Amino acid sequence: MEPTKIVENLYLGNIQNGIRHSNYGFDKIINLTRFNNQYGIPTVWINIDDSESSDLYSHLQKVTTLIHDSIENGNKVLVHCQAGISRSATVVIAYIMRSKRYSLQDAFNFVKKKRSIIFPNAGFIKQLAQFERWLNSTNSYF
């Protein structure tokens, strides 16, 4: 499956898209798998399982800021996990919430419309709801 363009310079994909990054011209990769693949371009690795008990929330503020700063600097960013369905979708939804001031539901629908196969696990949905509360209470939007 090809990586999916979500907004200008932000793509959601799977591990194969990371491996073949040169085919797509990515400048930065956010890797959300258990494997610390070095792609030869700037890569951020968050070692996390696709499990309802995995803590992705503690990374959301930092990784959404990183995505925002990268895009602002004109970089083409790929966010990927193994299949491009749960972990990477969660991070991209969080970024859309923060950058567009969307609710969790609106951000989920926005990303789902672009990449119909997304399906964050129930634990990640709860963490996105927590992230939404943090955004609303701190006004920490871009």
UniProtKB/Swiss-Prot annotation:
Entry keyword annotation includes Hydrolase: yes
PROSITE patterns for the chain: TYR_PHOSPHATASE_1, TYR_PHOSPHATASE_2, TYR_PHOSPHATASE_DUAL
Active site, UniProt feature: C81 (phosphocysteine intermediate)
Signal peptide: none
Protein EC: 3.1.3.-
One Gene Ontology term of the molecular function aspect: MAP kinase tyrosine phosphatase activity
Start and end residues of each Tyrosine-protein phosphatase domain: 2-137
Entry keyword set: Hydrolase, Protein phosphatase
Enzyme class (EC, first level): hydrolase
UniProt GO BP: negative regulation of MAPK cascade
InterPro entries: Dual-sp_phosphatase_cat-dom, Prot-tyrosine_phosphatase-like, Tyr_Pase_AS, Tyr_Pase_dom, TYR_PHOSPHATASE_DUAL_dom
Hydrolase among keywords: yes
Protein family (similarity comment): Belongs to the protein-tyrosine phosphatase family.
Protein name (database record): Putative tyrosine phosphatase 123R
Record organism: Invertebrate iridescent virus 6 (IIV-6)
